[in-house]
Amino acid sequence: SLSGAEADLLAKSWAPVFANKDANGDNFLIALFEAFPDSANFFGDFKGKSIADIRASPKLRSVSSRIVNRLNDFVGNAADAGKMAGMLDQFSKEHVGFGVGSQQFENVRSMFPGFVSSVAAPPAGADAAWGKLFGLIIDALKKAGK
């Protein structure tokens, strides 16, 4: 889990993203797919589609909403070691089942702080806290075999 201070940095940097969660969720997925085009192929609704087609897809909002809400759960529980352990275990098992592994989340970790910064300037130290959160996810996926 993260320290209380790290969890606070996550919450402060996440709040502006979550305040406009629908548009920001869509924008995050598009930014991920632009930075890592193969990422779209891990989503059945987007496999083989162009960015323009994904943007126009009625499925974009439902997929991005699930991602934003799951991230919100991680942010809200980041300092609770017990809850995080259970959440990470469930998350990693689900994602291994989807064929998603640690490399895909290394990609997310590399671009997510920049995405957060594009919404609102985060407090100092927030990028490192996001890196640590995604590091926990990556470690859980590796432990689950991916």
Swiss-Prot record:
Quaternary organization: Monomer.
Protein name stated in the entry: Globin
Domain Globin: 1-146
Record keyword Cell division present: no
Family statement: Belongs to the globin family.
Remaining remarks: This molluscan globin lacks one of the heme-binding histidine residues found in most other globins.
GO cellular component, one term: extracellular region
Gene Ontology terms for molecular function: heme binding; iron ion binding; oxidoreductase activity; oxygen binding; oxygen carrier activity
PANTHER family xrefs: CYTOGLOBIN (PTHR46783), GLOBIN FAMILY PROFILE DOMAIN-CONTAINING PROTEIN (PTHR46783:SF3)
Pfam families in the record: Globin
InterPro entries per record: Erythrocruorin (IPR002336), Globin (IPR000971), Globin-like_sf (IPR009050), Globin/Proto (IPR012292), Globin_lamprey/hagfish (IPR013314), Mb-like_M (IPR044399)
Modified residues (N-acetylserine): 1
Protease is among the record's keywords: no
UniProt entry keywords in alphabetical sequence: Acetylation, Heme, Iron, Metal-binding, Muscle protein, Oxygen transport, Transport
CDD domains, A to Z: Mb-like
Binding residues for heme b: 95
